[in-house]
Amino acid sequence: MDNNSVIGSEVDAEADESYVNAALEDGQTGKKSVQRNYATVLTEEDIRALMEIDVQSVSDFTSLSKAEATLLLSHLRWNVDCICKQWSAGAQSVRDSVGLLELDPPSDDNEYFCGACGESHPHKNLASVSCGHRICTRCWTSHINKIISEKPAAEWNLWLKCPVRVGLHASCPASVGLDTIERFASKREKFNYNQYLLRSYVDNRETMKWHPIQGSRCAIDLSPGSGNASVSCHRLVRFCWNCREDAHSPVDCKTAAKWLLENAVPCPKCKLRIPRNQDNSLKMKCLPCNYVFCWFCHVDWIEDMEGTGGDLHFCTFDAVLSDQRGKMSESDSNRYEDCYENWDSNELLMQKEQANLPKLDTIIQELSNTQLENVSQLKFILEAGLQIIECRRVLEWTYVYGYYLREDEVGKQNLLKDTQERLKKFVENLKHCLETNLQPFRYEEEPSKDFNAFRIKLTELTSLTRNHYENVVKDVENGLASVVSEGEASGSGRNQ
């Protein structure tokens, strides 16, 4: 192997610090880095505004009412371009396919019979959709309630039709639109129907997905070709766009799933993924919610122990795991322990930094008062904290990538170690500036002449760290392709 093709894994701390300082002096923070994600966080209000734009566009193009345009969009997957093309090719065909009939309006007699119950009602108590069949208020209310309460939301477009029977077994094909729902449905039913429209809009957009965290009511709109698939919402929770699990870049979904299957388990109560106990015991405790359960069968540990005399849990998985560990060679075992220790420690450090974010918000409020700065001008402090969290997350998963490298990929292993050490040094420098250099300004009673210099330094350190972090992600995602060696094949990893 050519020694010049591999960067040594032993990193001198002083050299790294000099590297960071030199980068700051040379203005490397302005260098172009890898492409970042362009993800937009959308609240329900934002989504409804986008829906309204599409509804208005279709309404203008087809000369349909907004309620009819909404019906058209919900039936045809909210694809405005496709609807316009189909409408131009044959409007009547499109109308028939979604149940928008084009018939003469009924006469305005004072009395008329309901087409559903057959009873006579004043004209003002009757209403019809595009078919013209008059239906009384009671029948509309009952019909809408039955469909929305009994049928799956995915089938509402199939069942929300005029209730009049036009034959022995056929019902009227005319669809019920939003205007009829708004007039006759209960408050709860209106809410459910509007939520259905909201969900169908997001579910039919290729670049849009709901945030997977429980309780989140926002969606993420990801611009095409925006780099790796790790995105976050306004709650600063990152997830993978492709598999909707916790963010795991720079490793792919398959590798992350394999590692998590063997080394982490979701808490049955709060769903947070918990790393495996380092002593390999089955008794797991979720610290956020204090739930105690079995690693393998997910049974509540306390309930399972009733009548057994304490922590006596018999689980066949324990024997299987011990057998698997026994089959590992000593070198494989050492590689695993080293990887798991670094993966777990970076996960814990990341969680610690996340827990520290509210403190940064408090500090920003304090500095806004003492340094006479707007809160928006102090967001560089929060950005530094968030960058540290992101670096810890990426470091965590680079160790998983390293574990699955083949044993003969020595060049990649050495380059990865060097890259990890450099990124850790960037994080340490940024963290030192954020925590140590920031502290004196918290106790100032009046604006400090040195605060602007601190702002410049922290901002540049954050930018420099971000650039290095993004290049680490890019390099690992590309399989450390910069390592060229005749002795190494181009395979993606070991034990795949």
UniProtKB/Swiss-Prot annotation:
GO terms for molecular function: ubiquitin-protein transferase activity; zinc ion binding. Preferentially expressed in roots. It catalyses: [E2 ubiquitin-conjugating enzyme]-S-ubiquitinyl-L-cysteine + [acceptor protein]-L-lysine = [E2 ubiquitin-conjugating enzyme]-L-cysteine + [acceptor protein]-N(6)-ubiquitinyl-L-lysine. Binds 4 Zn(2+) ions per subunit. A zinc finger (IBR-type) spans 191-253. GO terms for biological process: cellular response to hypoxia; protein ubiquitination; response to UV-B. Pathway: Protein modification; protein ubiquitination. Zn(2+) 1 binds at C114, C117, C136, C139. Zn(2+) 3 binds at C240, C243, H248, C253. It comes from the Eukaryota. Its cofactor is Zn(2+). SUPFAM superfamilies: RING/U-box (SSF57850). Keywords: Metal-binding, Repeat, Transferase, Ubl conjugation pathway, Zinc, Zinc-finger. The keyword Zinc-finger applies. A zinc finger (RING-type) spans 114-172, 267-297. Zn(2+) 2 binds at C131, H133, C162, C172. Pfam families: IBR (PF01485), IBR_1 (PF22191). Zn(2+) 4 binds at C267, C270, C286, C289. Gene3D superfamilies: 1.20.120.1750, Zinc/RING finger domain, C3HC4 (zinc finger) (3.30.40.10). Belongs to the RBR family. Ariadne subfamily. Members of the RBR family are atypical E3 ligases. They interact with the E2 conjugating enzyme UBE2L3 and function like HECT-type E3 enzymes: they bind E2s via the first RING-type zinc finger, but require an obligate trans-thiolation step during the ubiquitin transfer, requiring a conserved active site Cys residue in the second RING-type zinc finger. The active site probably forms a thioester intermediate with ubiquitin taken from the active-site cysteine of the E2 before ultimately transferring it to a Lys residue on the substrate. Might act as an E3 ubiquitin-protein ligase, or as part of E3 complex, which accepts ubiquitin from specific E2 ubiquitin-conjugating enzymes and then transfers it to substrates. PANTHER family: RBR FAMILY RING FINGER AND IBR DOMAIN-CONTAINING. This is Probable E3 ubiquitin-protein ligase ARI12.
